[in-house]
Design a protein with these regions (language model features):
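ATP-dependent carboxylate/acyl-activation modules
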Residues: 1-197, 201-323, 335, 344, ...
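Glycine-rich, proline-tolerant flexible connector loops at the mouths of alpha/beta enzymes
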Residues: 325-330
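Shared catalytic-loop signature of beta/alpha-barrel
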Residues: 333-337, 350-351
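Short amphipathic alpha-helix used as the core "switch/output" element in two-component signaling
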Residues: 340-342
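Short internal beta-strands
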Residues: 349-357
């Protein structure tokens, strides 16, 4: 469950972390009223994804009339599938430096990792690629939490490649001890998967302020945070009343399908998580980009296959679909009937590549061939074929 920026900042403020003064607006008039109170403000779309600025979802305005106009524009937007239902209007900051401070769950080590960088305002994943020396990490003991000397060491390690901060490094490290401890406590209390401040702004006066925030709660712990879940639902960007859910994943849940939306253009359907993951890898190896992960599970009926194909093709970015089936309790003839029915019922004209092996494989292949769908004989062959048919090129 992903919180909106303003919801994350409210939690930061309650934990004692400084945030800019702001007001939530659901109408252009409310944004104008916020500008009357606060003066020069940033009007920021409240959607649970990044890239708002590039999409035109953030505007800095000087007057109430400008705030009204920009709020009207932003509230009419749909950013990567998320309709903008509210804007956060907050005072601007004078910036001396932009830092990054985040806490996320390291599943391999089974504990939180605290990440600090002087390259704030950028995607931390990109910083890790372009300038890994600017990132420092700390894995605190889960029982003791981050100790002061550990955070100071983290801070100095992160500032080692930032000569502009050298004169104020000691004071900054001391302040980071306080903020990091508070952020960590908040992450634990809220069962967070990610708790991030980016950028953490250092003002010319030396104050650290959370200029943007990201907070994602473990869905398995939602029962412990009923009030927060209810609050998030009120500002939901998803049709099922939950904020932060990808609209395609929302639809898949309604259909009872195990589906993860990705950024590519080749739809992928498999049976079993391992086989489906392997199918994604094969598509990537042959130069394609998967649009999704969809596992139909064992013993899937023709109806379930039909449902899965319909789900995958709801994504307008999908140029073709790769169906990869290993027949154990899943029968090849049932899969073939589902694929054929979906093609005919939905009028599918995009490329379909089907690879199946195992139970009722020969019957399934016969049905596909009679319907004009040529099945692939191996998974690598199928992956290569769908990549070619969808106009992708190998690296």
């Amino acid at each position: 469950m992903k919180l909106l920026e303003y919801q994350a900042k409210q939690r930061f403020a309650s934990a004692g972390i400084a945030v800019p003064d702001g007001r939530l607006a659901r109408t252009p008039d409310e944004a104008a009223a916020a500008a009357e109170q606060l003066g020069r403000i940033a009007v920021k779309a409240q959607v649970p994804i990044g890239g708002r600025g590039k999409a035109g979802g953030i505007a800095v305005v000087d007057t109430p009339e400008d705030a009204r106009r920009e709020a009207a524009r932003i509230l009419s937007m749909d950013i990567r599938g998320y309709p903008v239902r509210s804007v956060w209007c907050e005072t601007g900051l004078s910036i001396a430096s932009e830092l990054y401070l985040g806490i996320t769950l390291d599943r391999d080590r089974r504990r939180f990792v605290i990440i600090f960088s002087t390259a704030g305002g950028m995607e931390i994943e990109q910083v890790a690629v372009d300038a890994p020396e600017k990132i420092a990490k700390l894995w605190p003991d889960p029982f003791a939490g981050p100790l002061a000397f550990e955070v100071r060491h983290l801070a100095f390690a992160g500032m080692a490649h930032a000569p502009a901060l050298r004169d104020r490094a000691a004071k900054l490290a001391a302040e980071l001890v306080t903020i990091t401890t508070r952020l960590y406590t908040l992450a634990v209390q809220l069962d967070a998967l990610t708790c991030e401040i980016n950028p953490l702004v250092l003002t010319p006066e030396g104050q650290l302020v959370a200029a943007d925030g990201k907070l994602e709660i473990d869905e398995n712990a939602e029962y412990r945070h009923a009030e927060l879940v209810a609050e998030v639902a009120r500002d939901s960007a998803g049709d099922d009343g939950r904020t932060g859910d990808d609209p395609f994943e929302v639809e898949a849940r309604k259909r009872g399908l195990t589906y993860v939306h990705l950024d590519g253009n080749i739809g992928v359907i498999g049976n079993g998580a391992g086989l489906t993951m392997n199918t994604l890898d094969l598509v990537k190896q042959h130069g394609g980009e998967p649009a999704n992960f969809l596992d139909i599970g064992g013993g899937a009926s023709a109806e379930r296959v039909h449902n899965a194909l319909e789900m995958v093709l709801l994504d307008p970015n999908v140029r073709g679909v790769f169906v990869n089936i290993f027949g154990g309790i899943t029968r090849g003839d049932e899969v073939a009937r589902g694929v054929i029915a979906a093609r005919d019922d939905l009028g599918i004209t995009k490329p379909l590549v089907v690879r199946m092996t195992g139970t009722m494989e020969e019957e399934g292949r016969r049905l596909l061939e009679e319907a004009g769908i040529v099945p692939a004989t191996s998974a690598p062959e199928a992956a290569e074929k769908i990549v070619q048919l969808t106009g992708n090129s190998a690296p």
